[in-house]
Amino acid sequence: MGVIIYNGVSSEEFAIQVEHPPGYETPEKDYEVTHIPGRNGDIYVDKGSYKNVSRSYDIAIGAGNKDFTIMANFISEWLNSASGYAKLEDSYEPEYYRLAAYKSGGTIENILQHAGRITVAFDCKPQRFLKSGDIPVIVRTTSKLRNPTGFKSLPIIKVNGSGKGNLRIGDYVITISNISSYLTIDSELQDAYKGTTNCNSLVTLSNGFPKLIKGENEISFSGGITSVE
């Protein structure tokens, strides 16, 4: 039996058990497909992104000493607690989490007022996130950072320092015209900011927002930059 944790709350708090491991749905690549009359085959243009995937769990519920209806209401409140995406973790891939939104309402089967069963489905972003990737790595001198996955990752980079500086990550060069203590560059959101202040006007990107390729990525900086996280 397995465990799921959604929006920071564990299924164990509701006496829920996942009956078996979920299936693994691979993400679909996002293509623009065009057909030219008189020409054999379609033209596929890779947009460089993937579509969402579904992740479903068959769960069994034990009401214990609680009334079944009360327990069912608790579970519904839990699954609908997030507005949009929230962290989804499970005991089958403990080193990863996903960003997921609960998408399926349904009927919880009532078994003699003492137990229940339902399939819950989440609409997930296509990527999995390594939990270790949420731990900041501080770079104070030229270094190499390893991406252990087989896919490019989109980092959140905190640049510390003052004044003007240049940051290189692999083939990506970032010029910052004015750093005031720190500045954050978010490759997922494609945004630069400091707290709630937009700083896109301070940043020049030679090759778009940086990505960490599979394997080692060299990081170096100059000017007023003192460290990078």
Language-model-detected regions and their locations in the chain:
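Short, acidic/charged, Gly/Pro-enriched secondary-structure junctions
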Residues: 5, 60-103
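Oligomerization/assembly interface segments of phage tail-like spikes and tubes
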Residues: 42-66, 114-128, 217
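Solvent-exposed loop and beta-edge segments used for protein-protein assembly and interaction
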Residues: 49-53, 80-82, 112-116, 149-151, ...
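Short polybasic amphipathic segments
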Residues: 2-7, 86-88, 165-168, 191-194
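A short, compositionally biased
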Residues: 1-2, 79-85, 159-164
